[in-house]
Amino acid sequence: MFYIKTKKKFKNNALEIKDIVKKLKQLNYVEDELTEKVEQNIDFAKRHLVDTIYKQAILEGVATTFADTESIIEGGKVNNMTSEDVLKIINLKHAWEFILNKNVILSDTNFALLCEINKIVEQGFYYTAGKIRNVPVTIGGTTWKPDFPIESKIKEELEEILKRNLDDVDTAIELLLYTMKKQIFIDGNKRTSVIYSNHYLISRGKGIIVIPAELTDEFKDLLILYYEGRDEKEIKRFIKEKCYMSI
């Protein structure tokens, strides 16, 4: 049995989020108020938070149930789960709380934000969390390997995506797939990418994207085809039709 002691083990999390918010304010934050649509979207995301985190955990291969995920998020106790899997769920909760913070939702969906999300997602796993990887990685199910990420190039390509003449949902999908394929960090790239693209959507009051648990295998198959450059259209259609939820 693994007892969840989030208040004790992660008592500094709120202070860490405040520090991150302060850093983001120094980078790009402008004092403003949330629109009614964005406030509604934040409430929508909060109402679906347990379900969203459960689905992200399944995508990550975490051995959890909806009930166990809910218990962990609420600070309860669970049976037959590893401490690593529990921590992944707790970190997802903290990452979502971070992007749903008013100051953060008003910040740009940029490279700095992407790094901060990964730092939270990978807290307690890698000391390099939130930093660009400098080691090669392999992807299960394919011989394709991503190039080493270059910060200046990533910033440039993210800006290029944001400047395209696309609607907000299509832009969010492009951000999600780009950051997944680049494998920018040593670990947690899918979790980071989903939350990052949702920051963009929510900041515009356009809903959320999450991969349904029952469609995880289909999504992974399409993702491999996308990585290999064999089919880019199908996964975008799949996400828009089966993973996107409007408010």
Segments and roles (model prediction):
Residues M1-I247:
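FIC/Doc superfamily catalytic core
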